[in-house]
């Protein structure tokens, strides 16, 4: 009976984290819809490692899901390394964007909004690792 209760409580926690991930995804989608720049600078996006960050978040989510399904502590532990990479990319992104704004002041608003996207991706990683702790 105690195991069943722990499982139910764990699922409630996971559900809460998944709801937050949905909120972050909605915020990122709103940025994409409302972005005033027709195309963001490709060189900037490469320096920011945005695609790598997005891929890491998706990979973390998939790995956490598999860890839960297979009750694998090893898989769950691997999620932490990916979160550390997200933290690194996020920290570097702020400096890159500050430098870019200094050189391209006309893109300041889009860049500031992009900081929010990075923060949402980084927080997504935090919520996924929190989900992992339940495994």
Descriptions of predicted regions:
Residues 1-135:
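Cytosolic, long alpha-helical scaffolding segments
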């Amino acid at each position: 009976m105690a195991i069943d209760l722990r499982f139910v409580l764990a699922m409630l926690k996971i559900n809460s984290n998944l709801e937050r991930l949905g909120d972050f995804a909605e915020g990122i989608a709103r940025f994409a819809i409302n972005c005033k720049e027709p195309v963001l600078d490709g060189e900037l996006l490469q320096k920011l490692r945005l695609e790598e960050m997005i891929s890491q978040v998706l990979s973390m989510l998939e790995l956490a899901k598999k860890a839960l399904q297979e009750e694998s502590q090893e898989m769950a532990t691997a999620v932490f390394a990916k979160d550390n990479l997200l933290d690194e990319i996020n920290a570097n992104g702020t400096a890159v964007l500050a430098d870019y704004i200094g050189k391209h002041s006309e893109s300041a608003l889009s860049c500031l909004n992009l900081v929010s996207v990075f923060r949402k991706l980084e927080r997504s990683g935090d919520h996924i690792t929190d989900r992992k702790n339940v495994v």
